A protein has these predicted regions:
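Membrane-proximal cytosolic segments adjacent to transmembrane helices
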Residues: 1-7, 100-137
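Alpha-helical phosphate/pyrophosphate-handling elements in metalloenzyme active cores
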Residues: 8-22
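Helix-coil boundary and interhelical linker segments in multi-pass alpha-helical membrane proteins
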Residues: 18-30, 80-90
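Loop-to-helix transition at the N-terminal end of transmembrane alpha-helices
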Residues: 28-42, 58-63
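Alpha-helical transmembrane segments of multi-pass membrane proteins
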Residues: 33-44, 69-77, 97-105
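A cytosolic-side transmembrane-helix exit/cap motif
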Residues: 49-58, 109-117
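Juxtamembrane helix-capping/reentrant segments at transmembrane boundaries
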Residues: 51-72
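Hydrophobic alpha-helical transmembrane segments and immediately flanking/interface helices
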Residues: 82-112
Length: 137
């Protein structure tokens, strides 16, 4: 039984080490992105529950999108290390983009759930929503 737990620990250590390398280490930006992604997913589920539209298919699609965010961060990190050679400009830009994107989604979810949102932020959200609707059409 002890060998089994040692194997499990070895697997988790290996996966954790690889993820740390792939994502460029666990710094404050990555922690912030993880927090925004998790909170956005939770508030999205809360919105689906309040609308009575909770679906495992939609939830799985949301998880796939969140995983893709971290894959893109990893790709940006690889480009920084292997192509550019130093720094983390691309990784940082990708993380900032997705933090802001998740933040907008989080505010939309909060507004949908009835949480009061400052008027200035509502105006910006409406402009962003109108812009994304035009791009889809």
């Amino acid at each position: 039984m002890k060998e089994f737990w040692n194997t499990i620990q070895l697997i988790f250590a290996g996966v954790g080490g690889w993820l740390g390398y792939f994502l460029g280490g666990c710094d404050g930006l990555l922690y912030a992105l993880i927090a925004f992604v998790v909170i956005d997913y939770i508030t999205g589920v809360m919105c689906a529950i309040s609308n009575h539209t909770l679906s495992s298919e939609v939830g799985f699609k949301g998880i796939c999108r969140k995983v893709l965010i971290f894959l893109l961060v990893g790709i940006a990190n690889i480009l920084d290390i292997q192509v550019i050679g130093s720094g983390s400009a691309l990784r940082t830009a990708v993380i900032f983009f997705y933090i802001s994107n998740e933040g907008v989604s989080l505010l939309e979810n909060a507004a949908h759930l009835g949480l009061p949102i400052p008027e200035k932020i509502k105006v910006v959200l409406e402009q962003l929503h109108d812009r994304s609707t035009k791009e889809e059409n």
